[in-house]
Amino acid sequence: MSSVPAPREYFLDSIRAWLMLLGIPFHISLIYSTHSWHVNSATPSWWLTLFNDFIHAFRMQVFFVISGYFSYMLFLRYPLKRWWKVRVERVGIPMLTAIPLLTLPQFILLQYVKEKTENWPTLSAYEKYNTLAWELISHLWFLLVLVILTTVSIGIFTWFQKRQETSKPRPAAISLARLSLIFFLLGMAYAAIRRIIFIVYPAILSDGMFNFIVMQTLFYVPFFILGALAFIHPDLKARFTTPSRGCTLGAAVAFIAYLLNQRYGSGDAWMYETESVITMVMGLWMVNVVFSLGHRLLNFQSARVTYFVNASLFIYLVHHPLTLFFGAYITPHISSNLIGFLCGLIFVMGIALILYEIHLRIPLLKFLFSGKPPVKQESRAAIG
């Protein structure tokens, strides 16, 4: 355990918040894309589809790198049990809160919007369970994955810490080219695992909990570990914060490959396996692109930025049902996709900010949506 706090990483805080807030334009653009979603506009937009695909191709990979970075930083700061408790509470409590308050009402809304209420009694027990697993976890899936990664990383982080204590500090002698090869092989390994499952027991791939707990965790664990390694080895982090023309060009080529796979691939063939390889390496390259841009443009302290850093999780949690409400009841009345998209951003962001300010004034809600226990008045007085 370290008593010396690490210097504040303002650009990483900002990037993490922006990646979270990107969920709003991502889901609103999904309404106007060619992808089939819960709610869709009458006529899809090609450029909003392109915008949606771009966000989807890299956002969460970069997010999990930052999560791994901060997780290991806090691992060194707290005793093991306290670290696990704090990390799980910070993501687990908001997730468990959002299920009854947000995703359950969202599920009921969609049942009426899609006129599925009459079909519900005809579903088997497993079909009901699986439907609820997909719909109630919904956009909260990454919180569940973070709980799992936090638990799994106890052994990994302990091993990292022991190696730091017993061996002399040395540079992480690994280039971005070598990292790219490693992540390409990891993508191939993930694709092979998925293909074997598809051959042996394809039905399990449609199981919501299996998808979230096993498949999503397997895909994102390399990025989470990479974040921890970036904290351990400053020179590795420097590789990501230094602009790389190769990573930028590689990410552009990977995105084109991603689009071609979306356009010409088949789910019954190798589309999902190909996508996993592409997004694995594109995610790595976009870490360099996003970190280098963020380090240059966002590495400063600002009250406004801090506000959105603190608000980003709450806004992300509430934006999804607001987006679906907008898509179901307001989108049909707006003929222009561009105007609809902009109105959606204003509608969702405006209401989310109002709800955020309201919840700050209710201590119970503030705790439930942040996982942070209230600071006792005695502690505040002592600090002051």
From Swiss-Prot:
EC code(s) of this entry: 2.1.-.-
Top-rank EC class of the record's enzyme: transferase
Transmembrane segments: 17-37, 54-74, 91-111, 140-160, 173-193, 212-232, 240-260, 274-294, 311-331, 338-358
Protein keywords: Acyltransferase, Cell membrane, Membrane, Transferase, Transmembrane, Transmembrane helix
Membrane topology: Multi-pass membrane protein
GO CC entries: plasma membrane
One Gene Ontology biological process: glucan biosynthetic process
Keyword hit for Transmembrane helix: yes
Alphabetized GO MF terms: acyltransferase activity, transferring groups other than amino-acyl groups; transferase activity, transferring one-carbon groups
Biochemical pathway: Glycan metabolism; osmoregulated periplasmic glucan (OPG) biosynthesis
Subcellular location, record wording: Cell membrane
Keyword Cell membrane part of the UniProt annotation: yes
Function: Necessary for the succinyl substitution of periplasmic glucans. Could catalyze the transfer of succinyl residues from the cytoplasmic side of the membrane to the nascent glucan backbones on the periplasmic side of the membrane.
Listed NCBIfam families: PRK03854.1 (NF003014)
HAMAP family (UniProt xref): MdoC_OpgC
Family: Belongs to the acyltransferase 3 family. OpgC subfamily.
Protein name, as recorded: Glucans biosynthesis protein C
Gene behind this protein: mdoC
